[in-house]
Curated annotation (Swiss-Prot):
It comes from Shewanella sp. (strain ANA-3). GO terms for biological process: nucleobase-containing small molecule interconversion; purine nucleoside catabolic process; pyrimidine nucleobase metabolic process. Gene3D superfamilies: Ribonucleoside hydrolase-like. Its EC number is 3.2.-.-. This is Pyrimidine-specific ribonucleoside hydrolase RihA.
Amino acid sequence: MSRPIILDCDPGHDDAIALILALAHPELTPLAVTTSAGNQTPDKTLNNALRILTLLNRSDIPVAGGAVKPLSRELMIADNVHGETGLDGPALPAPSFQPQAVNAVELMAEKIRQSDKPVTLVPTGPLTNIALLLASHAELHAKIERIVLMGGAAGVGNWTPAAEFNIFVDPEAADIVFKSGIPITMCGLDVTHQAQIMDEDIERIRAIANPVAKCVAELLDFFMIYHRDPKWGFVGAPLHDPCTIAWLLNPALFDAQDCWVGIETQSELTLGMTVVDRYQLTGKPANATVLFGIDRQGFVDLLVDSLAVYTPTYLNRR
């Protein structure tokens, strides 16, 4: 039985790969793709979502742009990681279709309302759109099965010593989401830094020799550049956002623990920190399933096998 999902993203190399991974599997039914600012400015992330869906010949999936800035803070982007376009590296097609006239929140609300099954939200950028949806449509909470997000860390951050980028960009939005009572799966840096793609994995992808695999290999070639900085201690590049889709497809690839997670919204030193109570020290009930480990080889094999699906016949089936 296929699971209806809405992908809320800020493409971004790893967002694009998460989207490509999701659309290779009939077990997931994408009802919509929505975008926010984050890895690049809102106009660029929206355009990037349209370009990736054009590459995949999926103009049937409605796309809408969302929040242009965080709830109460100034916009921050990660152009040092993702380049001038947000998807530097491959030559992507121009969009073949237009975004919806409604904004991201209203498109999500419409699709959740219309769905005959509870919908899973998959945010892989800042949580602004999701927070706005939850705040403005309380009547739809019961129709959201789960929020599977990329963000946070139980350990150290990657944007500040304490905070991961997506949560740091809009901690107030993250606070709303984690306090919502909706089941959450948190794919934080603890697991995504283990989900590294290596040079030899990129060559496996390139050898698939279809247009989508070629695009992903070229995305990863560029993505590797930032992560080769010795300060990170990486051998490869961490594929953060695809962990959300991989968990939906095969949760057995991951080690997980139910924890209480709180968001720091005030501290000068630890703003945006996800405080993960792994040892039940606070006595507060768990509000998230937090991923801590991954079968890296199984994850890479899933990605490679998924990219092999994108034959010309598959791409032209609609």
